[in-house]
Amino acid sequence: MNATPTARSAHVDTFARDHLPPRHEWPRLLLDGPGLRYPDRLNCGAELLDRTVERFGADRPAFRSGGLPPWPHPDPGDGRVPAPPRTWSYGRLRATVDGLARVLTGRMGVVPGNRVLLRGPTSPQLAACWLAVMKAGAVAVTVLATQRAPELRTICRLARVRHALCDAQSAGELHRAEVPGLHVGLFGHGGPDDVLRDDVVRDDALRDGELRDGALRAEPPGRRPRFEAVDTAADDVALIAFTSGTTGRPKGCVHFHRDVLAVADTFSARILRPRPDDVFAGTPPLGFTFGLGGLVVFPLRAGACALLDRWSGAARTLRVVQRHGVSVLFTAPTAYRAMLEQLERPDADGPWDISSLRRCVSAGEHLPAATWHAWHERTGLRLIDGIGATEMLHIFLSAADDAIRPGRTGFPVPGYQARIVAPDGVTPLPDGTPGLLAVRGPVGCRYLADERQREYVRDGWNVTGDTYVRESDGRFRFVARADDMIVSAGYNIAGPEVEEALLRHPRVREAAVVGRPDARRGQIAVAHVVPEPDAEAYPNAGADGDAGPDAGADADGQRDRQRDGHAEGNPREGRAERVERAERSAREGRAEQEGELAELAEELREFLLAELAPYKCPRAFVFTDRLPRTPTGKLQRFRLREAERDHPDADPE
C-alpha cells in the first residue's frame, strides 16, 4: 500500500503538510500487515492516553519521577510549595494534559497545525506537554535541553515555529535565540504564568465558560472537564524531529499521527512485548525519537509505567533500576559496558539488585559482540540490539529472545522489509555482499522542504546510509556507517569492525577507528583508544611519537611551581639551574611515557594481526582519557574525523 495524504486534514495552519516532499518522492508505505490497518481519522494523543485510560482505568501509574529538583506546585490551602507527587496516575496525567491543551488553544492561541517547540529535561511535565500538543492537533518540535541558541534559531526558522513550551530552567538559550514572534509558555517555576499551575488551567477553563467560579479548584483532577482531542486525520503531521545536523543543515523528519502508533505496534508490540506491569526507563532524552518511543509512546500504548527523570553515570542508572524496579531499559552500548564495571563495585547498601530487569534494549550505535556476551554472562539477560533512524522514527531491524545472535542486528521487525543494495541505492546485492541498507515499512522518510529527500528515498525504499550484509539465514549484520568506511590503498576498512576487535583486548576500555588523509594510500586507519586504568599508558598522548594536547601539563605545572618559589631540590641551586633540572625531568618523563605508549601500541598491533586481515590494522594509535560522545553516550566519530583532517601528519594530496 502506497499511502499518501488523502483524508481531510484537521490542520488550519497547513505549513507542515504543504511542505512535504512531492508524493512521487515518498517511500512506499506498508500498511496492510496485522495491526497496521488504521482508520482514516485518529489522534495519537487520544489513542495513547484516553483509550488507555478506558482500557486500564485512571488509577494505574503512568509516570514516575525521582531525583529531579522540586517542581513548584502551589497548594491553594496554605500556600506551601511542595515537591510533586513521585507517581503520576493515568487519571492525573490526563487531567494535566487536558488542562494544558486548553491553555495552548486558549490563552496561547495555538490552532491545529501550528508548530510548538518543546524544550526541557526528561520529566513527566515535558511528556505531558508533548501529549497536549498531540491532542490539540498541533505539531510537536521537541529539542534537546542542551541545544544552543544558534541551533534553536535554525530549527525555529526551518519549521516556522511561533509557539513554545519550555522548562523555566532551560529557557535561557531559547530567549537568547531571539526567534521573531515566538510566544513562550514556561513551566516548572511556580510563578503566576506557569502553564502547568492549577490556577492557570482553571482560569482558562473559566474563560471558556466551562465552569462556575471556583468549581475547578474544588474538583479532584479526575473529575475536571475533559479536552476533546482534535479530530486529526491519520496522516496529519504530528511531529517534526530534526537530525543533529553534524554534516550541515539539520533535516526535519516529518511523521504523522499514524506513524507514532505504528512504531508501537511493530517494534514494541512484536519485539519488546511489554506488559501493563512493566516499568520503563532509559537515558535517551525525549528530543530523540529513540527516547520518545521508549519512554512515552511504548509504555503508554501498553498501559505500563515509565520513569521520566534525568541522570547520568552507571552507578546512577543501577540505582534507578534497583530503586524503581525497572523492567525495560533503553540505553546505548557504552552505558551497558559502564554498568558492567559498576556491577563489580557494590553499592553502599550492598550488592546491586537489578533482578527486576527483563528487557534491555541497546541502540544509538553498534553493539559489539563482546559487550553482549559480557552483559549476558553477568546478568543472564540477552541484550536486544536494534537499528533505527530519525527518518524512520524508531527501530526497524532487531531480534528478541532465541532469535538473537551476538554481533548481528537481527531481522526486519514484523511489518518492515529490508534488502542490501549497491551504491546506486537501487540494484539489489546477493547475500554475503556488503552494501547499503534499504528498508521500507509502515513509516518512512519525509523531509520538510528538503532536496535531500531524493538521496534518502530511492525507488520507494529508505536508504539509510548504513553498510550491512544480509547473511544466508536472513539476519542482517552491521558493517559500518557509510561515512565510517575507511578506504586505504583500495581496501575497504570498516571502523566498527576494528573497534570491536580492539575491545576484546583486556587493556582497552573504549576505542574508535577513523581515517586520516594520506597521499599514498588515500587514507590510513587511526585507532583512538581509552586504555583501562591499570594500563601503562597516559591519557591524551599519541603513540606515533606526537604528544597529545595535555602531554606537557606536568612540565607546565613544574614551571608554575618554580615561579611560585616552590621548586624542589638543592636550596643552593640558582633559579636557572632549578628550571633546567625541572625541564630535564619533564623531558625524561615524556620520553618514558612515549616509550610505554609505543609498547602498548605494538601490543595492540600484534593482537589485531591475530584477529583481522593485516590491511585492517591501524597504522597509528592515539591514546586519550575519553572519546567525544553525545549526552546519551553516542560516539561522535565526526569529531575524530575532523581532528584527523587537521592532524600534522594528514596529507590529502
What feature does the model see in each segment?
Residues 59-61, 201, 206-211, 222-242, ...:
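Conserved pre-ATP/AMP-binding loop-to-beta segment of ANL
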Residues 147-150, 164-166, 329, 441, ...:
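AMP-binding/adenylate-forming catalytic core of the ANL superfamily
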Residues 419-438, 471-473, 595-601, 636:
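Conserved beta-loop-beta connector loops within the AMP-binding
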Residues 94-102, 234-239, 253-275, 283, ...:
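Conserved structural elements of the adenylate-forming
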